[in-house]
Design a protein with these regions (language model features):
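A ligand-binding cleft/hinge motif common to bilobed small-molecule-binding domains
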Residues: 72-84, 133, 161-183, 269-270
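Extracytoplasmic/secreted envelope proteins and their assembly/folding machinery
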Residues: 59, 112, 129, 157, ...
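Short, glycine-/small- and polar/acidic-enriched structural segments
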Residues: 1-133, 138, 186
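Secondary-structure end/capping motifs
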Residues: 204-278
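Pocket-lining segment of extracytoplasmic ligand-binding domains
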Residues: 147-148, 152-234
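Conserved C-terminal helix/tail region of periplasmic/extracytoplasmic solute-binding proteins
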Residues: 272-292
Length: 292
């Protein structure tokens, strides 16, 4: 049997569980894959222009296969990916990630309503895409919400910091970077994250994995200050001298509660109401098939 493949997900829990040997202690045979920082903006000190829409994101990377036993992504994408047969959604756990729409420190935009007609840079078929729509539809008519698909999370941070876009949706470590660099938060868009499991992962392995993460989550809840340094591993070096990770929050929090049928079905209806997926990407599997 192949080893359970664990990937860093831009959050603290996997790093803490690895540091404390929790995966080993629960008897999980695994390998830890450190996801490299690979973005179109990586390795540059400044971004000088904004790209055209990049219509590729979390869902598309799942379609292609991520090479790990379990993938974390926003619950909208995991919901649709599981329905389309790209894995199964683990129904016993979800996460909640702080997220927000930011503008530059000197932006003339002051209120959420000022975002009407303003292109907000998000990641296509990713948490920022859906959470921006969900958050703004409480303030603006749908036809006044405008999006720009600017690539991955770190790409969006670079575009905002370097003044190439008027607004961007950020979460994880980039959320705290934007705060420390003086960017203004116009709307909180905190969202749920789901977990997609591959066909090669057994229930026993998954239960061991989440047992280890539960212990890590308890450690983070008790003393997040001991682990915030791991955020530097998730950020390009250009930001390291500009920030103090000790001032960061803890980021994503894993909630060890079920992701129920009602939420699954309500999420699907909302996605359909926006027409966010073309027919060739839509799945038809219901909760009883898509969720384990």
């Amino acid at each position: 049997m192949s080893r359970f493949r664990i990937q860093s997900h831009g959050r603290l829990q996997e790093w803490v569980a690895e540091e404390k040997n929790y995966f080993t202690e629960v008897g999980l045979e695994y390998e830890f894959l450190v996801k490299p920082i690979v973005t179109w903006s990586a390795g540059v000190e400044r971004v000088d222009s904004s790209p055209a829409d990049i219509q590729r994101g979390a869902f598309e990377s799942i379609e292609d296969g991520r090479g790990c036993s379990l993938s974390a992504a926003c619950h909208w994408t995991v919901n649709m990916a599981a329905s389309a047969g790209h894995g199964k959604m683990w129904g016993n756990v979800y996460s909640v990630s702080p997220s927000a729409i930011f503008v530059a420190p000197d932006s003339p935009l002051q209120s959420t309503e000022d975002l009407a007609g303003v292109p907000i840079t998000v990641g296509y078929h990713s948490g920022s895409h859906y959470s921006t729509l969900q958050g703004l539809e409480k303030f603006l008519p749908r036809d006044q919400i405008k999006l720009h698909f600017g690539g991955l999370l770190l790409d969006r941070l670079a575009l905002l910091v370097d003044g190439q876009v008027p607004a961007a949706s950020l979460f994880g470590a980039p959320f705290y970077v934007a705060e420390q660099l003086g960017c203004k938060k116009l709307l909180d868009t905190t969202f749920m994250i789901g977990h997609l499991v591959s066909e090669t992962a057994s229930r026993d392995e998954l239960e061991k994995y989440f047992t280890a993460l539960r212990r890590a989550q308890h450690d983070i809840d008790l003393e997040p200050e001991a682990y915030k340094h791991y955020f530097l591993r998730e950020l390009p070096e250009r930001y390291h001298s500009q920030i103090d990770v000790r001032r960061f929050g803890p980021g994503e929090r894993i909630v060890f509660e079920p992701y129920p049928r009602e939420v699954f079905e309500r999420t699907r209806r909302w996605i359909e109401s926006w027409g966010l997926f073309p027919p060739e990407q839509k799945g038809s599997a219901g909760y009883e098939i898509a969720v384990v």
